[in-house]
A protein has these predicted regions:
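Extended hydrophobic
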Residues: 1-163
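Extended charged low-complexity segments that act as oligomerization/scaffolding linkers
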Residues: 6-7, 24-26, 30, 139, ...
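Alpha-helical repeat solenoid scaffolds
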Residues: 28, 79-83, 147, 240, ...
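Amphipathic alpha-helical scaffolding segments
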Residues: 46-52, 101-106, 150-151, 158-162, ...
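C-terminal leucine-rich, beta-strand-based interaction scaffolds used for sensing/assembly
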Residues: 94-241, 245-256, 268-273, 284-287
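Generic helix N-cap/helix-start motif at coil->alpha-helix transitions
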Residues: 96, 148, 168-178, 200-207, ...
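Long internal repeat-built scaffold domains in very large eukaryotic proteins
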Residues: 202-312, 376-505
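Extended amphipathic alpha-helical scaffold segments
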Residues: 304-364, 368-371
Length: 505
């Protein structure tokens, strides 16, 4: 992105959000073609949607062609030619000049050769010389240069037909349908499912809705926030599909209504971590889960997330924090490493992330977040401001009277103690607080209510009290079965040997 912006000499003028919206090479190229050698001022966020970029690009080359004195203001020969060629190429790989010429009307016929050369220079079409044999006259063949541009033009034609209440029965490529769904939501404020005169399968409709919501402008996406939340609540599988197709692609756009903030709001809605884990933390295809409502086929994959110094803490970093609840320790390790690396270079942003997530009702997440915070504090070049701000927060929220009850977690206290001690060691924090961060702590500890029936219970009575060595209870008994002779296998082997002997006779 930065290389393209520099090469085309574009001044974004603090419009950092543009980087997140231009998610494909084609969108970036169109943007650079339109705004090259200029300063981007106040820009509407829907102006960088791919369909708007194509529309603006085609309008701009029409103006260039018009300024050359090739057509009048009332004519749109470039656009007309592009739509015509796109329509003809739906059934063919390439076209001859004569085929295009025979489909034209005046005044395009008189300017066709010039128009085709012009749009080829702009990259919309591609030409090659073809010969049947070495003695025949070369013939020019035309094919499409930019596939997304072809999809856009066909979608534009389909949209006009839909608005005229024509029934769309022919089948088109996924790229055309994607462009159509995006044009519909941008210009008609409708999802593709709201049109009765186009027939699509439920699966295709869902895919197109996700594509449109992930790629439309922020203003329009905000209208569908409640709708997306409703889809997320439908099932764990639907939720994971929404995360993969909508939330992940939009989370690098600052304050996107369908991005990581929506995910955070949804996951915080679970009363207990175990309820949330079924939707978010467990892997797919669990054994004996065919009849379970949490059965999933879509794996939550955040391995491709790469954090940069431009990332806001409420964007992709927030997703990585939530992934710390995974039951896969390799996933947790990867997320901790990414957050640590990012936090070292963006300590103020990480401080905001840490304090924002400190009230999540998941001990595993809280422990991992503070382990990252401690790791950053131990860095050789850690900023004093980070140590001071985080130490202040820890003293007010972890080692306060309320905090000792809320964070009654030895792991969290260990990391927090280490952070404050590091601030004291660096001589940026008051040493007098040291007696408050070292046990014993004075507070009313929370005690789990005892089950009275369990006091009189015997072994194997249903309450399973720990009546002998804890290590053996937790470890040995649980693994004992792995070291027993496999009676079923041995029995199977004996029967097999008898069967083989019988048939040998």
């Amino acid at each position: 992105f930065d290389t393209y912006i520099d090469y085309y000499n574009i001044d974004l003028d603090r419009n950092i959000w543009i980087k997140g919206m231009l998610r494909t090479p084609m969108a970036l190229k169109l943007f650079c073609d339109i705004y090259k050698n200029s300063k981007v001022g106040s820009l509407s966020k829907n102006s960088v949607v791919i369909t708007k970029l194509f529309q603006k690009k085609i309008n701009s080359i029409e103006i260039v062609y018009r300024k050359a004195g090739k057509e009048t203001d009332s004519q749109g020969m470039v656009m007309t030619t592009l739509v015509m060629v796109a329509n003809m190429l739906t059934d063919k790989m390439e076209l001859s000049y004569d085929e295009i010429y025979s489909a034209c009307k005046e005044p395009i016929k008189s300017h066709l050769e010039d128009i085709l050369k012009f749009v080829e220079e702009e990259g919309f079409i591609y030409s090659r010389q073809s010969q049947k044999d070495v003695f025949s006259i070369p013939e020019t063949k035309y094919s499409w240069g930019m596939q997304p541009a072809f999809d856009y033009l066909m979608a534009r034609k389909l949209f006009d037909a839909i608005k005229e209440n024509k029934t769309i029965e022919a089948k088109y490529t996924n790229g055309i349908y994607q462009m159509l769904s995006l044009i519909a939501i941008e210009e008609d404020k409708k999802l593709i499912s709201e049109y009765s005169n186009i027939s699509l399968s439920d699966e295709t409709t869902f895919d197109l809705i996700c594509y449109a919501l992930a790629n439309t402008s922020v203003e329009i996406a905000s209208v569908y926030r409640d709708y997306v939340k409703e889809l997320m609540n439908y099932s764990s599988e639907e939720f994971r599909e929404i995360f993969d197709r909508i939330i992940m692609p939009t989370s690098n756009v600052p304050d996107h209504p369908l991005g990581s903030i929506l995910l955070d709001e949804f996951l915080r809605g679970f009363e207990k971590p175990a309820q949330r884990d079924i939707w978010w933390s467990i892997p797919t295809y669990l054994i004996d889960s065919n009849d379970s409502y949490w059965r999933c086929y879509t794996e939550i994959d955040t391995s491709n997330i790469k954090l940069s110094n431009d990332d806001n803490y409420l964007g992709l970093p927030l997703i990585l924090v939530w992934r710390l609840s995974s039951v896969d320790n390799d996933v947790r390790k990867e997320c901790r490493l990414k957050l640590t690396e990012w936090g070292i270079n963006n300590s103020e942003q990480f401080f905001n992330l840490c304090t924002y997530c400190a009230d999540i009702n998941d001990e595993q997440i809280i422990e991992d977040v503070f382990s990252v915070a401690y790791g950053i504090a131990l860095g050789q070049n850690v900023q004093d401001k980070y140590l001071i701000s985080l130490s202040d927060w820890i003293m007010d929220n972890v080692f306060s009277d309320e905090g000792l009850v809320r964070y009654e977690n030895v792991v969290v206290r260990y990391y927090c103690t280490g952070i404050v001690k590091m601030a004291i060691y660096k001589r940026v924090y008051d040493i007098d607080v040291e007696n408050k961060i070292i046990p014993p702590y004075t507070y009313q500890a929370s005690i789990m209510p005892a089950c009275e029936e369990a006091f009189d219970a015997g072994r194997m009575s249903g309450y399973d009290p720990i009546d002998y060595d804890l290590a053996r209870y937790v470890l040995c008994d649980q693994f004992d079965c792995f070291f027993r002779p496999d009676h079923k296998t041995n029995s199977y082997s004996e029967k097999t040997e008898k069967l083989i002997d019988e048939y040998r006779r």
